[in-house]
Curated annotation (Swiss-Prot):
Keyword terms: Cell inner membrane, Cell membrane, Membrane, Transmembrane, Transmembrane helix
Protein's organism: Edwardsiella ictaluri (strain 93-146)
Topology class, membrane: Multi-pass membrane protein
Gene3D superfamilies associated with the record: MFS general substrate transporter like domains (1.20.1250.20)
GO cellular component: plasma membrane
Protein name, per record: Protein TsgA homolog
Family to which this protein belongs: Belongs to the major facilitator superfamily. TsgA family.
One family name in Pfam for this protein: MFS_1
GO MF term set: transmembrane transporter activity
Disulphide bonds in the chain: none
Localisation per UniProt entry: Cell inner membrane
Record-linked InterPro entries: MFS, MFS_dom, MFS_trans_sf, MFS_TsgA, MFS_TsgA-like
């Protein structure tokens, strides 16, 4: 593979994470406008966005097999067509059923693209470089989460229709489409007919189970925590909307800075050991936040939490890809699917807890989930295969 082709494939991966981040995080910015557009209460409108998460989950799960049947390039080109149709449907459709269908299609496109982007990074890069590259790729999710809410706020403040926000997000897929046309993709499964020695199927091992549980609990814990921080800060400490929102902003800012830092630092550490340390520190920082009696300390704790937890999820995925000698798209997508399930379960799990016991109980539950992540990382240390396969080398 030429260096120029490797760079193009890497940028496709970057943009794939940015696309998913923009679609998921911008939801809160446009929900009120969409509810007004359809003349529905915002509580009812929020349920329709489940179609977006469902589309992401279904496509990531199925693409573990589809990647070996349908060429990656063809999938991305077809995804561009679906993206255009979905955005057009949002613009011309004035029906809630059409809106829900378009959200599902956007989720499918996003999930397919992100699963391909993740596989490309795990396929192109090896050893510790794989972890640092995947972490830098994941930072584009957060960057999109910072940039597109600003774009959305600017457009909505100028009374521009909400669907133009999704048209702006579509520009990311336009970049993916252009890069796709210029790139050569690795062939998988039956497509790889040129290989003289077919790759022997490898057993995943129990380590993948530990990693999958950790990925699900991490995402569920993270989103369950950050979604209820504003409510907790307002009720417990009497913070204003601006102050409680600032806590969330501090978390994501520190999270992105942490991603950039660890994308370099991870090259010098064994991934299983460092993710165990980070999980322990994250559990401790979240405990300090949840148990703090001083509102002035909350910003410091949440900044620390965002920084030390930023590398956990992508490191779990990287370790998963290293449990086999040759990176398996099915294995990577399985761990991604578990993380996506955690996303979908966020309000299913935390909603009843908040209704029954308040936001503090939801944060305490998230803290418990982070503790589970730490335990899974410790158990992984006894069974991991990444050192056996030589992936621990620089």
């Amino acid at each position: 593979m030429t260096d120029s082709n490797r760079i193009r494939l890497t940028w496709i991966s970057f943009f794939s994470y940015a696309l998913t981040g923009a679609l998921v995080i911008v939801t809160g910015m446009v929900m009120g406008n969409i509810a007004e557009y359809f003349n529905l209460p915002i509580s009812s409108m929020s349920n329709t966005f489940t179609f977006l998460n469902t589309g992401i989950l279904v496509s990531i799960f199925l693409n573990a097999w589809l990647m070996e049947i349908i060429p990656l390039k063809r999938q991305l080109v077809f995804g561009f067509i679906l993206m255009i149709l979905a955005i057009a449907g949002l613009m011309v459709g004035h029906n809630l059923a059409i809106f829900s269908a378009c959200m599902f299609v956007l989720g499918v496109v996003s999930g397919i693209t992100m699963s391909i982007g993740t596989f490309l990074i795990t396929h192109i890069y090896t050893g510790r470089q794989r972890g640092s590259r995947l972490l830098f790729t994941d930072s584009f999710f957060s960057m999109a989460g910072m940039v597109f809410p600003i774009i959305a706020a600017t457009l909505l403040a100028q009374h521009v229709a909400w669907y133009w926000v999704y048209a702006c997000i579509g520009v990311l897929y336009l970049a993916i489409f252009i890069l796709t046309l210029c790139s050569d993709f690795p062939q998988l499964g039956k497509q790889a007919v040129g290989d003289s020695q077919p790759v022997r199927k490898e057993k995943w091992g129990i380590g993948v189970l530990f990693l999958s549980i950790a990925a699900l609990c991490y995402i569920l814990g993270q989103l369950g925590f950050i979604q209820w921080v504003p409510e907790y800060a307002a009720k417990r400490f009497g913070m204003s909307i601006e102050e409680s929102g600032g806590l969330v902003s501090n978390f994501w800012t520190a999270y992105m800075v942490g991603m950039w830092f660890f994308s370099v630092a991870l090259r010098f550490f064994d991934l299983q050991r460092i993710v165990t340390v980070l999980a322990a520190l994250s559990t401790f920082m979240m405990y300090m936040f949840v148990s703090s009696q001083q509102s002035a300390m909350l910003s410091m704790y949440i900044l620390g939490l965002g920084f030390v937890s930023s590398a956990i999820y992508t490191t779990l995925i990287t370790l998963g890809s290293q449990q086999t000698k040759v990176s398996s798209p099915k294995l990577v997508n399985f761990i991604l699917t578990c993380g996506t399930i955690g996303t979908m379960l966020t309000f299913v799990v935390t909603g009843p807890i908040v209704a029954h016991s308040g936001a503090h109980a939801a944060l305490a539950t998230a803290n418990g989930l982070y503790l589970v992540v730490f335990v899974m990382c410790v158990l992984l240390g006894f069974v991991t295969k990444h050192r056996l396969h030589g992936h621990a080398a620089k």
